[in-house]
Amino acid sequence: MARKAYSEEDRVQVRNALMTTMIQCIADRGLIHSSIDVLCRKVGISKTFFYSFFSSKEELVLYALRYQQPKLLDYARSLMEDPGLSWRAGVETFLKNCCYGAKSGVAVLSIEEEQQVRHCLSEENFQAFRRDQIIFYGKLLSIFS
């Protein structure tokens, strides 16, 4: 079987598809039930091609969580700017839809899943992710203030 040649634009689309598919899989089934095989099948690529983007499922999870951050910040902003919602109602809506299990397409890891991801990461990747999370939560708090 001949290999497909991917342009740089194709690679960007595949990478984005992997991240959005991972987010959806985590939101729908949780990380444990989100295998590389399932992701590759949904995106339409081989496992070999997957590994040209990410070294592991856990590395993809980090990138996917970063990838959804702008969407979450925009959502928080829209709630705070909604004249029909009080500050409290806006924050409660955000937490309900994004953190407490509402089926809103947002990837949220359980404590066990976070520990699994942490265990598989290099110290460098973990520290970089931790810095990104601190920045993200700072922006979120700024929106809610």
Annotate the PLM regions.
Residues 70-73, 77, 120-145:
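Amphipathic alpha-helical packing segments from all-alpha helical-bundle domains
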Residues 63, 77-104:
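Hydrophobic alpha-helical connector segments
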Residues 25-59, 63:
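Helix-turn-helix
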Residues 1-29, 37-38:
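Basic, helix-initiating cap at the start of DNA-binding domains
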